Amino acid sequence: MIPRTALSALLYASTSFAVCTKLEDCPQFEALKTDECQTYHHFLARGSTSPYPGHVIETVGKVCNALNTKENPKACGYEDVQYWAMNGGERWCISSHEGAMNGAEQMRNYTARCPDSHLIVMGFSQGGSVALDVLGGGGGPLWGCTQEDNPPMNISSAPGSKGATLIFSQLLGLN
């Protein structure tokens, strides 16, 4: 279970509006990108057509600022969920499925290497859909295409039992 401090940091950070999307435009966050074992490790799923790491990097920075301490300055970091991040019909379905499969595999690999880490999954826009599909399974018809199925994570075992999720999205189709 992630301690209250981490959850408080997540909730606090979720109120910020992220504007930095490209890592080269945000050098202050470069040190957070790692695949090394950490106490808290984010998996970021960017929005459609966004560059890596995407819209949630500033939120990750705030969360990590709250979790990194003098005693453990590298307690928190992130890695990008690797996927195409494209929109529009069939491209969305292919991209989302790729993200869900890759995100789940990245989390499994990380947990195998770093079994004591707490996992935080963050997604924005299409990345929010990818994050939900990673954790809960996905697939089916959407916007004129059919996304291939992917299985949900087992919440009784790692990595499914080790995560917290934060999704940023927009409501679609509301008039």
What are these regions (language model features)?
Residues S8-A9, V81, G140:
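Intrinsically disordered regions, especially transient/low-confidence alpha-helical propensity segments
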Residues I2-P3, L44, V81-G88, F124, ...:
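Broad hydrophobic/π-residue packing in well-ordered secondary structure
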